[in-house]
C-alpha cells in the first residue's frame, strides 16, 4: 500500500511539472504570435506533456 501511495504521489508530481512546462511554452508561443494561440497548438502541447510524463514514469519504474 505504501509503494502505491509513493507511485501516485510521483505521478502527480510529474504531471504538475509537465503542465507547468506546457504553460511556459504556451506563454512563449503567445509572445511570438502576438497573443494568439490556436486550438491545435494547445492540444499538441497538452498531448506532448502527457506523453513526456508517462515516459518519465515508465522509465522510473522500468
From Swiss-Prot:
The keyword Flavoprotein does not apply. It comes from the Eukaryota. Residues 23-44 form a propeptide. Keywords: Amphibian defense peptide, Antibiotic, Antimicrobial, Cleavage on pair of basic residues, Immunity, Innate immunity, Secreted, Signal. InterPro entries: Frog_antimicrobial_propeptide. Residues 1-22 form the signal peptide. One of its GO terms (cellular component) is extracellular region. It is found in: Secreted. One of its GO terms (biological process) is defense response to bacterium. Expressed by the skin glands. Its main location: secreted. The keyword Iron-sulfur does not apply. Antimicrobial peptide with activity against Gram-positive bacteria. Has been tested against S.aureus (MIC=37.5 ug/mL), against B.pumilus (MIC=75.0 ug/mL), B.cereus (no activity detected). Does not show activity against Gram-negative bacteria (E.coli, B.dysenteriae, A.calcoaceticus, P.aeruginosa) and fungi (C.albicans). Does not show hemolytic activity against rabbit erythrocytes. Mainly adopts a combination conformation of random and beta-sheet. Belongs to the frog skin active peptide (FSAP) family. Amolopin subfamily. This is Amolopin-P2.
Amino acid at each position: 500500500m505504501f509503494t502505491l501511495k509513493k507511485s501516485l504521489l510521483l505521478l502527480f508530481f510529474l504531471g504538475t511539472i509537465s503542465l507547468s512546462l506546457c504553460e511556459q511554452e504556451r506563454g512563449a508561443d503567445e509572445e511570438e504570435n502576438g497573443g494568439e494561440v490556436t486550438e491545435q497548438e494547445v492540444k499538441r502541447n497538452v498531448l506532448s506533456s502527457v506523453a513526456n510524463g508517462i515516459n518519465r514514469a515508465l522509465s522510473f519504474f522500468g
